[in-house]
Amino acid sequence: MTVTNKPVKPANVPVMDFEAIHASVGNERKKYLRQLDEAWSHHGAIYVINHSIGTRTLEEAFAWCKKFFDLPLAVKNSVHIPPDVSKHFQGWTGTGEAISSQGVWDPDEIERLRKETPTELKEAMELQDPCGTYPPGAPDLNLVEQHLPGFLDFLKKWFAACYKQSLQNMRLVCEILGMEDLDYIGKKFEPRHMSTHSTWNYFLGQPVSQLASGSANRLNAHTDYCQFTMLFQDMVGGLELHDYEEDIYRPVPPIKGAMIVQVGDLLEKQTNGRWRSALHRVTAPSRYMYEGSAGDDDELVQRYSLVFFGHLNLDEMIEPLPGCEKQGKWSTLEWKDRMTAGQWLARRVALEYERKTAATVM
């Protein structure tokens, strides 16, 4: 089939070199901080090169991710996410079990969307800090370790690396906002508090024609419910970011070794709308959607992504940060109730995963 979607230019997301930023001083540093401020306000996202996680750790992470999703269904089911996922946010989910949505708060409306919209053709593994204390009823990752020796050791390495980078992100936020204490946010951000988590995604191969026509889907448009998202794509592509000015989605092509740092709902709320929570989705790579042609029988290659969500400690109230007393331009998601980060997380997770009737695992 020939893809007839009109050509769309990629999102103009800036590429920021964190090594250069951390080494900068004086006016050069002020320039970098201003660029970050503008990017998170306009796009809600940046590319980051030369980050602290490193190429080797990323390559290991993608290898472990693929090994996990290649496991037999029975093994993955042994660590299936519990029905009350808002209390035990860890475990594997199969195709059709979760649904991403934006601004839908009614569980009945979520059920209608599940029935009437294309299924998100992906599997996911939700992971919490392996050094943390899990509540009773949480899936036992030792069941994965039995089939993938070294899995838990790598998870410890992965969380430590992502946590280190997250703290660097938070220090930059504090510096941009003019705080004297650059660890102000980091002190409210502890991985073993069991709020911060990582998601590994496996997007199944499917005909390009289905994605281009909208009859199939990979990941619905949504914002993330954290402070910052650190996203690592493979080189397949398919991520798109909403352009509010043109009201279209623009591709965010992968850059090898780079991470994408996106503002989440919590940070938009904490900055009082100064920065924008990034509305994004996953579909076919732009070369199929907008630029070329593919035969009807062509299968879209599989896609993997690794995501780390930086999140406030669960007992912290969601309120504006120092320096953000003035109302900004963004209000991506409205919620008037004053609540803790834990209440917000439970609310969003329950809508995404919990349902009235059991899903069929594919």
Curated annotation (Swiss-Prot):
* EC code(s) of this entry: 1.14.-.-
Lineage, top-rank taxon, reads Eukaryota
Q: Where does 2-oxoglutarate bind?
A: R303
Q: Which pathway is it part of?
A: Alkaloid biosynthesis
Task: Extract the InterPro entries matched here.
Answer: DIOX_N, IPNS-like_FE2OG_OXY, IPNS-like_sf, Iron_ascorbate_oxido_reductase, Oxoglu/Fe-dep_dioxygenase_dom
Q: Which GO terms describe its molecular function?
A: dioxygenase activity; metal ion binding
- Residues given in the record as Fe cation binding sites: H222, D224, H280
Which PANTHER family does the UniProt record give? 2-OXOGLUTARATE (2OG) AND FE(II)-DEPENDENT OXYGENASE SUPERFAMILY PROTEIN-RELATED
Please report which protein family the annotation says this sequence is part of. Belongs to the iron/ascorbate-dependent oxidoreductase family.
- For this entry, the protein name equals 2-oxoglutarate-dependent dioxygenase lolO1
